[in-house]
Amino acid sequence: KTREFSQQFAERAFRRPLTAEQQLFFADSRFADSKPASDSVKEIVLLSLKSPRFLYPDLGQADDYSVATRLAIGLWDSMPDDELLRAAAAGRLNTPDEARQQALRMLRDPRSRAKLRNTFHHWLGIAHAEEIAKDTEQYPNYDKSLEADLRTSLNIFLDNIVWRTAGADFRKLLNSRHLPLNERLAGFYGAQRVKHLGEFGPSFFDHERAGLLTHPYLLALYSYHNSTSPIHRGVFVTRHVLGRSLKPPPAAVVFKDDTFSPDMTMREKVTQ
């Protein structure tokens, strides 16, 4: 059983069956002397995890197993499952249609949703977002529970566009009028309440809001603790949406909306 485990571990690490040479080097030869079996297993595990064939998924021949590896890493951030390995062993991944069928199966797995959500979080700059601090005097009803609800609302918004909206594409992320609200958020924004606390239902906000760029969580994240920040939001849009780089500012400037005339537009304030 120890030898069988060692072989299976190396095959899982390499995401394909071992060749005869690999079988000898990574498994059989490690049990050739009289050292304890546990030491042999440790040695095999370390050798496998240090091998370029584990560290570099594209290393090796392009075949069904490499297709299985690309699917698993691309959709799950993981290794191929048993179904993928069986399909690769049977040579059922060598055409686009066969690979597409496996991809559709994998998209129904919760791991695909988790992978895509993480991708969105990195794109939006919220993967490692710290707590959003707000002025308690200016926003007395803002607390950590409300912040958690805002983040949940954003996640549900993304899920609804990607997984539940037929024919949706990237544009829908930017122009959808749908904003998931629970009772607490509805009360905070003065919108129509949903029936049960904690249940996020659909709501259509005012006509000035649409899509990700006006979602309350992102607006709260890319702003100061007591005021708006068109600079932070502009940098976010430029870098994360338009994909353009920005030079460092010539000097540190703090934008304070109340220092400008109320008759000025936001564009005029930022330009000045």
Question: What are these regions, as identified by a protein language model?
Answer:
Residues K1, L24, V41, L55-T69, ...:
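Long, ordered, helix-rich scaffold segments
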Residues T2-I44, P52:
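A conserved hydrophobic secondary-structure block that centers on an alpha-helix together
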Residues T2-R3, T19, A37-V41, S48, ...:
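Active-site-proximal structural scaffolding
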Residues Q8, R12, R16-T19, L46-F54, ...:
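Glycine-rich, acidic and aromatic/proline-enriched surface loops and short helix-turn segments
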Residues L18-Q22, S40-E43, K115-T119, A166-L173, ...:
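Surface-exposed patches in mature extracellular/periplasmic domains of secreted proteins
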Residues L24-D28, A87-R92, E98-A103, V194-L213, ...:
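Short linear loop/turn motifs
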Residues I161-R184, F188-Q192:
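Gly/Pro-rich turn-and-neighbor structural signature
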Residues A186, L197-Q272:
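Sequence context surrounding c-type heme c attachment/ligation sites in exported
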